[in-house]
Structure formats: structure tokens, C-alpha cells
């Protein structure tokens, strides 16, 4: 049996018309429907015309949000030797090698992002069953397997995000906070759109963009006019 909607959600849904909104209008409505008693995130859900079970239709990459994410990112780094000092100096929240691997193997997940140097990946790979389901496994495509720890930590702390299409071809991403001005949210959303277009899988056939919806964490889903977003030119 379908769960009954709260009066709050029913009222919010009534504000949303069954149309694809212009990007700015959609974001303004998303902000208006962010009425929960906590600071809600701005979410985007994008259905693409890909089938990720095929290797040439998988999408996993990164995007830099020009206005940031609005949240503190806790970065853990697995490295050894002089790279430990480099990571510490760059502002990593947790740094270690065998000691950190052991902590994670025992269930410690007190971080939002895990970066590793290539030489320690054989050891990190043993944590796959713990890290994989949480989307925390370092990967070269995601920019989280690197020797340039200082640059990677700086970028992820500043608003760089790793994202992927799930097994149904949908990208789920938080692109800021609902408290951001519409202009800031639009800049971030445009960056996401451009990243997805730029990284179109080689095996993608037919219509690439299917639907795009935005919502506050506890708000209703609002469809965005994809063509209007892709054609949008922001002032530089």
C-alpha cells in the first residue's frame, strides 16, 4: 500500500505544475518548496539514454561546482612515506596507511571522500566490499587515485564532486544548498549539465538526455526544460 503523503508534502506538490520549467523558474520553485526544519540540499536527478551494463555506456567522472557544495567535505587519504606529510599539509582530515586501512576494515567511515596514491591501491582494493556500496572506493576516473594529493584535496574541498550513472542510467547529485541564491544554483547546475555532455559515453546511442528533475531534500520533484538548460549562456 502506498504511503500516505503528509499535509505538508501535499501542499507543496500542489505548487508544482506538470510541466518542464525554465531553469531559473525551476530553481526558484525548488527554493520555495524547501520548507523542512533543517538546511535542505539541492538535488538533481538526471535520466540518461544509456545502459551502464555495457562498458562503453558507463558514466563516472567529476565536476567542479563553481559556487561550491555548501558543506564541509571530510577527506581521508591513504598514502605512505612523504605523501603522508603532503596530505596533512594540504588539509586532509585523516591520513594514514596500514593503520587507516585497518580502521576502515573495522567499520570506521568518518569521512565523505577517500583518496589514495596508486602504489597503495592493491591494499585499498581489499576494502572493496566496504567502500564500494558506499561509493567511497577510490578510482582514477573519479580523480581519487592520484600522486598529486595536494591538488586533489584542494579541489574536492573547494567543490569538486565525483558522480556516476547508476545501473538504471540515472545520475543523482547534490549541487548545493537550497539557501544558495538562484544565480549560484544555476551556475552549479549548468556546470553539471556541461560535465555530463562533455563526458558522454562513446557507446551512447539515440537520445542522450531523457529527463532532469531538481528537488529540495524533503521537497517535491520539479522537472527542468533540458533544452533550455543546455542552450543557456551564463555571463562570464
From Swiss-Prot:
Keywords: Repressor, Ribonucleoprotein, Ribosomal protein, RNA-binding, rRNA-binding, Translation regulation, tRNA-binding
Superkingdom: Bacteria
MF annotations from Gene Ontology: rRNA binding; structural constituent of ribosome; tRNA binding
InterPro entries per record: Ribosom_uL1_bac-type, Ribosomal_uL1, Ribosomal_uL1-like, Ribosomal_uL1/biogenesis, Ribosomal_uL1_3-a/b-sand, Ribosomal_uL1_CS
Keyword hit for Transferase: no
One Gene Ontology term, aspect cellular component: large ribosomal subunit
GO annotation, biological process: regulation of translation; translation
NCBIfam families attached to this UniProt entry: rplA_bact (TIGR01169)
Family statement: Belongs to the universal ribosomal protein uL1 family.
PANTHER family per the UniProt record, alphabetical: 54S RIBOSOMAL PROTEIN L1, MITOCHONDRIAL, LARGE RIBOSOMAL SUBUNIT PROTEIN UL1M
Protein role: Binds directly to 23S rRNA. The L1 stalk is quite mobile in the ribosome, and is involved in E site tRNA release.
Subunit annotation: Part of the 50S ribosomal subunit.
Name of the protein in question: Large ribosomal subunit protein uL1
Organism: Synechococcus sp. (strain JA-2-3B'a(2-13))
Organism classification: Bacteria, Bacillati, Cyanobacteriota, Cyanophyceae, Synechococcales
Gene: rplA
Amino acid at each position: 500500500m502506498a504511503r500516505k503523503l503528509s499535509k505538508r508534502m501535499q501542499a507543496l506538490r500542489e505548487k508544482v505544475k506538470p510541466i518542464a520549467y525554465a531553469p531559473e523558474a525551476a530553481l526558484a520553485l525548488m527554493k520555495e518548496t524547501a520548507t523542512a526544519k533543517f538546511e535542505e540540499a539541492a538535488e538533481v536527478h538526471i535520466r540518461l539514454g544509456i545502459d551502464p551494463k555495457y562498458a562503453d555506456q558507463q558514466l563516472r567522472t567529476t565536476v567542479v561546482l563553481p559556487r561550491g557544495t555548501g558543506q564541509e567535505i571530510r577527506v581521508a587519504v591513504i598514502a605512505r612515506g612523504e605523501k603522508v606529510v603532503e596530505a596533512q599539509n594540504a588539509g586532509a582530515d585523516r591520513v594514514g596507511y596500514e593503520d587507516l586501512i585497518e580502521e576502515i576494515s573495522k567499520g570506521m567511515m568518518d569521512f565523505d571522500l577517500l583518496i589514495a596514491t596508486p602504489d597503495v591501491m592493491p591494499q585499498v582494493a581489499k576494502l572493496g566490499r566496504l567502500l564500494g556500496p558506499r561509493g567511497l572506493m577510490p578510482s582514477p576516473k573519479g580523480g581519487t587515485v592520484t600522486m598529486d594529493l595536494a591538488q586533489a584535496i584542494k579541489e574536492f574541498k573547494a567543490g569538486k564532486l565525483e558522480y556516476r550513472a547508476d545501473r538504471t542510467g540515472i545520475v543523482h547529485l547534490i549541487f548545493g544548498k537550497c539557501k544558495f541564491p538562484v544565480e549560484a544554483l544555476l551556475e552549479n547546475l549548468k556546470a553539471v549539465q556541461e560535465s555530463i555532455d562533455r563526458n558522454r559515453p562513446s557507446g551512447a546511442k539515440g537520445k542522450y538526455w531523457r529527463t532532469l528533475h531538481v528537488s529540495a531534500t524533503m521537497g517535491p520533484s520539479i522537472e527542468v526544460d533540458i533544452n533550455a538548460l543546455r542552450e543557456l549562456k551564463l555571463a562570464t
